[in-house]
Amino acid sequence: IQDRHYLKEPDQVELIPGAALALKRLMDQGCRLFVVTNQSGIARGLLTLDDHRAVQQRLQEILAGYRVELTADLMCPHLPGKGCSCRKPSPGMWTALKDEYGLHPRQSVIIGDKISDILFGFSSGLKASILVLTGHGQAEAQSLGLDTSFKGLYQLPPSPGGARPHVLARNLAAAETWISSMNAIGPGLV
């Protein structure tokens, strides 16, 4: 969705152009879709759990118009630095999803726009971490010293310690293209 600072109004939920169609193509290939999100605005008192639920409900409604269904969404409401096991990049949300849905890390990918998403993928042992340049992605990639002038997608050489993504993708459609080309993704796309 389009990034809005501490999004709490369902009527402000707006998809990034092309995102729903890319998600639909992934679903058509048998991928299950999950959302894992840090929502420290709840702990900060900037939004409530009900606000978050209303936003997620609106997202589900919009996606349903494209025949896209999220299998589940998990969120961490805690502040950074509070030592919880669920806040990305910690793997707590992955562990919960893996246990409940029988996911396998080597058949799962994370697509995100923040370094914490990428580190979450590494800490969870996922097959790949894809940084999209939408939302915060452009600034995050530049903070890692990565060239963002490419078109489509760019596969990076392995990174010791998982400090950078496996793949940079211009947007979700480019990420979907890479996943489709892998032909190794089974039952679980995070």
Locate each region found by the language model:
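Short, basic/glycine-rich phosphate-binding loops at helix/coil junctions
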Residues: 1-3, 34, 72-80
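A short alpha-helix capping/helix-coil boundary motif
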Residues: 1-3, 38-40, 96-98
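Active-site neighborhood of HAD-like aspartate-dependent phosphohydrolases
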Residues: 1-34
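A short, structure-level motif marking secondary-structure boundaries and short turns
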Residues: 6-9, 43-45, 78-80, 102-104
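Acidic beta-strand-to-loop metal/phosphate-binding motif
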Residues: 36-38, 110
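A short secondary-structure junction motif
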Residues: 39-52
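Asp-based, Mg2+/Mn2+-dependent phosphohydrolase catalytic module
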Residues: 49-71, 80-109, 114-190
